[in-house]
A protein has these predicted regions:
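Small-residue-enriched hydrophobic alpha-helices in membranes
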Residues: 1-121
Length: 121
């Protein structure tokens, strides 16, 4: 079954977000993140995409996200920043995880840079 590029992107975004929440080991609500609404509006993410995300790998999702438009990459970065900012202080491991994710999708931005952008909006 082949997916459209839009569907592949949505599922890849959900896969990465679910993996991040799981790795954080706390119950974080993705949908209550400040920037998630904009990300959802821009990509048309539906609840079913989170279900679909359970059957794809994080690695294949990163490959998909590399080709995504930079506006969407920015919204993903801001949403991940929202998730991580729920933990105070944000641990070094989370900052490194953020930068590793951004490098993997070819959107090299540091956590401190995205945090500054997030706070000025």
């Amino acid at each position: 079954m082949s997916m459209s590029s839009g569907e592949s992107e949505r599922i890849a975004i959900c896969c990465v977000l679910l993996d991040i929440v799981e790795a954080m080991g706390i119950s974080a609500d993705i949908k209550s993140c400040r920037h998630y609404q904009s990300l959802r509006d821009k990509t048309d993410i539906a609840d079913s995409d989170f279900e679909g995300a359970r059957s794809v790998s994080v690695l294949s999702s990163l490959v998909t996200l590399k080709g995504m438009h930079y506006n969407k990459k920015m919204l993903l970065a801001l949403t991940v920043c929202d998730l991580f900012s729920g933990q105070t202080p944000v641990s070094l491991n989370l900052r490194i995880a953020f930068e590793t994710l951004m490098n993997a999708i070819e959107w090299p931005i540091s956590f401190s840079e995205i945090l500054a952008i997030s706070r000025t909006e």
